[in-house]
């Protein structure tokens, strides 16, 4: 997030016509990005991991392309997605991580992670798989169209905070990504 903050400050400065500030924040951001890429990459796992020097996977690294840290077609990201599929995907649900935490081994999948995987697949050109996983997620909404924070991968029971803004925002943002733009749909031939 340090990199994202500095990168966004550079973009804001550029938009405001402040090239010196933009150059400053870009100069601060780039070494942080390089440290992130080098520190989070685990050669043995062939994946970006939860923390520098860690062997544990965390689905949050699926956000790296969206944040602009790395391109989705980078071989390291492609390999990371494959690792996530092998180790964090449970019956179409994506665990945030598989390592034990303060509460023990995770038993429920964090719903936003499914949308992160859909976005990753979409970015990698796996459009049919992405759409199928997204449509399947819609079946877990309650009668008001709402999602909770977590879901039990074995039963499909919603768990955790309800309704969960993070899950709902993920649904909306992913739906927008998978949709044709209004310009393409209504104003182009």
State each model region's role.
Residues 12-15, 127, 140, 181:
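Alpha-solenoid helical repeat scaffolds
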Residues 30-111, 132-189:
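Extended glycan-interaction surfaces of carbohydrate-active proteins
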Residues 107-127:
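C-terminal substrate/ligand-recognition segments
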């Amino acid at each position: 997030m340090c990199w994202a903050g500095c990168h966004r400050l550079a973009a804001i400065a550029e938009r405001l016509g402040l090239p010196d500030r933009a150059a400053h924040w870009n100069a601060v951001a780039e070494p942080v990005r390089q440290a992130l890429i080098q520190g989070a990459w685990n050669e043995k796992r062939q994946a970006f991991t939860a923390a520098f020097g860690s062997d544990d996977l965390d689905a949050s690294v699926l956000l790296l392309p969206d944040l602009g840290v790395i391109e989705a077609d980078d071989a390291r990201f492609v390999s990371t997605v494959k690792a996530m599929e092998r180790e964090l995907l449970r019956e179409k649900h994506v665990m945030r991580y598989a390592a034990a935490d303060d509460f023990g081994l995770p038993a429920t999948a964090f719903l936003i992670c499914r949308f992160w995987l859909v976005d990753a697949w979409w970015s990698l050109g796996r459009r049919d798989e992405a759409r199928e996983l997204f449509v399947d997620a819609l079946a877990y909404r309650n009668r008001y169209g709402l999602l909770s924070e977590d879901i039990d991968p074995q039963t499909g029971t919603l768990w955790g905070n309800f309704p969960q803004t993070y899950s709902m925002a993920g649904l909306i943002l992913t739906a927008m990504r998978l949709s044709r733009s209004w310009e393409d749909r209504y104003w182009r031939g």
